[in-house]
């Protein structure tokens, strides 16, 4: 009798695991397929906007008009004030985000890049993915827990399609919402979603991001103290960036209650700043600047600070886009500058800076390690891991996302349950 019970229990478990595999494999493929398609279109749209802006410098002077258009689109779609924080909240609660957020952020980000606002694309990808997943969750009438998992699938899928880092995308979507509480059951559906989205994006011609790090130094005491200096200073810069992003948004809302006026004024300020600095390097995402550091070792010491200013004004005024590419820009330029000061190659310093800045502003050390491997390869991975963990500790509870929940203290196992600031 006891053996029969064990056999029956084993059979039930096998069936449950097979059913979960088929169910979440199918849902992951579905969300990843659609997310990959939309994400690839989004990446191509941003690339087109960037090329058009480069070929037509006069487009910058239409930035205030673009701001008005973005506010109008968001009001038309009834998603004003909805962003990445609301997507995170949807993972933790029964609140979803409107499917109309996807076309709104798609169009808003494209306009921002076309006309010269300083923004990225990966934060927008998280919103598109969350919006698509919410739609499928309602369509299939999934329960609350399954909708949470599907939202993470959507986020990981579109992120992987846009940036070309499926491993980091899988873990980031799980890790970023509630730091310290890692939903391991979401790993399988998220990797199915991110891998399938990544594969489809490749087929559609979206090239993954990758940087060649030459002259990686030996792992010794002489190198390590230099890496630690870069990591700690990048952690401080990550706190400055988070503060600037939140303060910029609060200041614009305080000074200009009307959203249309806020966006128009922000556009004018970005135009004036661009004319003042005499370069277009800080408009758009800035991937070309990052590439030059790795390929030519060219870096300007003030670049990281100017990118913080441009991005905080752009996003604070109501323009749309992500914060991740600006984060990589700030990390690469600051890391490259510091590397020259301590006797390391700019490319190696840029890799260390990117890892430290990304971890400092997102509080996602595991995703940062995977991102470093996918972006730079394995040779510099140990240095990037150490830099990321040092920055994670020194950056405190600052975060780009006020909706991010930090479950545990960074100093002990004490449960604190605070939100990023």
Language-model-derived ranges and their functions:
Residues 1-421:
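Alpha-helical transmembrane segments and immediately membrane-proximal extracytoplasmic
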